[in-house]
């Protein structure tokens, strides 16, 4: 049996796409280009305690506060940049500062090679600064989660894709895990 050696995954194989549709009719997930930083932090919430009959403290993760720190060079005519800049410059609040982002792992393809694993989440754009430096107009801030993460896939498997179409479900071709639980529950009820 042939053993395949592990391969290092390049950062460029995890690509983010933002919904730039302003009409609300049909999502248009466009590639988030020209970002100089896009670092995801999970920010786990811990519950730590020490019981009187034990010598060691215990810790559990009880929640998360995911945030993605970003920085980009502003390009006029880039719909993603214009959407984020409008939130910064207009000091938008509440739902007006929310964006949907699909993150695609182009290195995670199904066995047929026609789908890539993706996640979707709604974030609040939290502006930090703009105008830093003299070479380009730079915007920076963070995207903080306002929804649960949803797993799905995209059928665009080319790393150079400028847009993607996201579908909720299992990229390996099976039933989505939440749908599976519902089916199993219904199966038991019907027995």
Residue ranges and their predicted role:
Residues 13, 27, 44, 66, ...:
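Polar low-complexity intrinsically disordered regions enriched in Ser/Thr and small residues
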Residues 87-93, 122-125, 143-144, 161-165:
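Short, low-complexity, polar/charged sequence segments that are solvent-exposed and flexible
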Residues 5, 106-107, 179:
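Generic N-terminal leader/processing signal
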Residues 1-71, 75, 122-135:
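Solvent-exposed edge beta-strands and adjacent loop segments
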Residues 36-40, 104-151:
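Short beta-strand and beta-hairpin "edge-sheet" elements
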Residues 154-191:
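Intrinsically disordered, low-complexity terminal/linker regions enriched in Pro/Ser/Gly
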Residues 8, 22, 39, 88, ...:
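Intrinsically disordered, low-complexity segments enriched in small/polar residues
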Residues 54-120, 148-156:
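Extracellular/virion structural assembly segments
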């Amino acid at each position: 049996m042939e053993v395949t050696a592990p391969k290092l995954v390049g950062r460029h194989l995890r690509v983010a796409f933002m919904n730039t549709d302003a009409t609300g009719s049909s999502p248009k997930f466009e590639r988030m280009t020209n970002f100089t930083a896009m670092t995801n932090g999970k920010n786990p919430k811990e519950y730590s305690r020490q019981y009187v009959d034990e010598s060691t403290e215990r810790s559990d993760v009880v929640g998360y506060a995911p945030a993605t720190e970003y920085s980009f060079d502003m390009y006029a005519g880039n719909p993603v940049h214009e959407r984020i800049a409008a939130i910064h410059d207009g000091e938008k609040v509440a739902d007006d500062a929310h964006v949907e982002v699909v993150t695609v792992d182009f290195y995670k393809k199904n066995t047929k090679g026609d789908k890539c694993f993706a996640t979707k989440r709604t974030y609040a754009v939290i502006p930090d600064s703009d105008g830093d430096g003299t070479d380009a107009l730079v915007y920076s801030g963070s995207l903080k989660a306002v929804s649960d993460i949803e797993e799905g896939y995209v059928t665009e498997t080319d790393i150079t894709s400028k847009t993607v179409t996201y579908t909720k479900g299992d990229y390996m071709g099976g039933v989505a895990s939440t749908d599976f639980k519902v089916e199993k529950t219904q199966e038991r009820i019907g027995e």
